[in-house]
Amino acid sequence: MVKNSFNSVIPQEENKGSVEFQVFNFTNKIRRLTSHLELHRKDYLSQRGLRGILGKRQRLLAYLSKKNRVRYQELIGQLDIREPKTREF
């Protein structure tokens, strides 16, 4: 599972406030909600919650990519997350 591969990214100390840990938790919640919504397609409240969690994770990933691009690339590689499309004006 993803949890085992993530242990190498974050040391064993208490890092519950780190961006990587928060993105990891949001990713686990997203995967659980996605599997739930495959069974319960009309659960609109869960769909709304999923969209909120996706937005929070997207904002955290944008912050991490601005602050430390190397850690960002490692994290999306470890968690198997697609890199979001960037808007160009």
From Swiss-Prot:
One Gene Ontology term of the molecular function aspect: structural constituent of ribosome
Pfam families: Ribosomal_S15
Chief place of localization: plastid
GO biological process, one term: translation
Record has tRNA processing as a keyword: no
Keyword Plastid: yes
UniProt keyword annotations, A-Z: Chloroplast, Plastid, Ribonucleoprotein, Ribosomal protein
Subcellular localization(s) per the UniProt record: Plastid, Chloroplast
GO cellular component assignments: chloroplast; ribonucleoprotein complex; ribosome
Listed SUPFAM superfamilies: S15/NS1 RNA-binding domain
InterPro entries: Ribosomal_uS15, Ribosomal_uS15_bac-type, uS15_NS1_RNA-bd_sf
NCBIfam families in alphabetical order: S15_bact (TIGR00952)
Binding partners and assembly: Part of the 30S ribosomal subunit.
Similarity field: Belongs to the universal ribosomal protein uS15 family.
Protein name from the UniProt record: Small ribosomal subunit protein uS15c
